[in-house]
């Protein structure tokens, strides 16, 4: 199933988490069964179509609920915890 997102928060969160955990786009794509170009398109807001399996894999990898990936500003949340 494909999930269509309405805004760029998912892409911003994905980029933040990927960089925080020191993954390249290529590495992340291999882990979640996708392609680096797809990761780039999500992060830059060029695409809002996210396969539900990829979404689940991202959530599991980073230990983040899917709802937080979509709705929350994770960068702000992580900064407030410091």
Regions found by a protein language model. Give the residues of each.
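Conserved hydrophobic/aromatic packing and binding residues within compact polymer-binding modules
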Residues: 14, 28-29, 39-42, 69
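The alpha-helix within a helix-turn-helix
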Residues: 18, 29, 59
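Recognition helix of helix-turn-helix/homeodomain-like DNA-binding domains
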Residues: 33-49
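Short, basic-rich loop-to-helix N-cap that marks the start of a DNA-contacting helix
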Residues: 46-60
């Amino acid at each position: 199933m494909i999930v269509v997102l309405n805004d760029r928060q998912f892409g911003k969160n994905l980029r933040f988490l990927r960089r925080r955990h020191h993954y390249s786009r290529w590495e992340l794509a291999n882990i979640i069964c996708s392609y680096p170009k797809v990761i780039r398109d999500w992060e830059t807001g060029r695409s809002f179509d996210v396969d539900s399996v990829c979404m689940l894999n991202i959530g599991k990898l980073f230990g983040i609920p899917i709802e937080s990936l979509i709705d929350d500003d994770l960068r702000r949340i992580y900064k407030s915890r410091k």
